[in-house]
């Protein structure tokens, strides 16, 4: 009498897969027959191959992420401790040693057209760039995020009026409006920070509004409304935690944009006034000697490029990590 008990499917182990599909095994029907002979799904090797490739890409992305994070940590540390590091005075002129090449005696990265040490000016220029960019991004996130949260939550006429005003600001060419405001309020560190922060408010408000609209339709928010929770409790207890992370991740990406923006202002001579060094002003000064000493413009441009690249990569990884829509892809 035949056995009516159901057969137990074989357990799939790495050894089973390796034995069924050895390296160099034939593809096509022969390979499929070998796999079916062991009771395995013929699509399993392809799935395992895709998974292995994804793991390799993820591992490589993780290495680049940590390299970018280390570079940013070094830049921030140098900017914060520039006054205590064994560096030359960034404003001290030595006309005898002007335009010295890199690795010169006492000047690791050489000197500029006035004999000032490039390494010292890079370190102190990093401080100016980071102060302006971090402060401006913080202002934009705080003010714009609050506006976007309120607009997305209350809706109605308040949303219409507020978004109309923000769209009017966004309609102006950003660089032209920035140049006009800087020329009007002055070129102090505080003035430039406030102007750049003000111009970034509409962008953060739109991001916060879109995230708030999506979070307001979640089941836990609807449940809180049904239980009689106040608007304040729902806004700050339920919606704000879900809005803060995407806005902060977007702010990290925008940090690179602000660094380039400040560098552009300095290149045009509209950032902080001399003799305070900035990366953009160093590039502008090196432009005059491109035919003879290219390192004057190349070194600060390279430092700015690597910093912005690291900020963009870290911000993109964090944004995809905390963005619910992308984390499911």
Where do the protein language model's features map onto the residues?
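Hydrophobic alpha-helical transmembrane segments of membrane transport/permease proteins
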Residues: 66, 74, 78-113, 268-276
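Generic hydrophobic transmembrane alpha-helix motif, especially the helices
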Residues: 108, 112, 118, 142-144, ...
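Transmembrane alpha-helical segments of polytopic membrane transport and secretion proteins
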Residues: 1-73, 313-329
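Transmembrane alpha-helix signature in integral membrane proteins
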Residues: 118-153
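Membrane-water interface segments at the C-terminal ends of transmembrane alpha-helices
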Residues: 72-89, 125, 164-188, 256
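Short hydrophobic alpha-helical segments within the ABC transporter permease transmembrane module
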Residues: 118-125, 165, 208, 216, ...
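Glycine-rich helix-loop "coupling/hinge" segments at transmembrane-helix boundaries
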Residues: 170, 181-185, 196, 210-212, ...
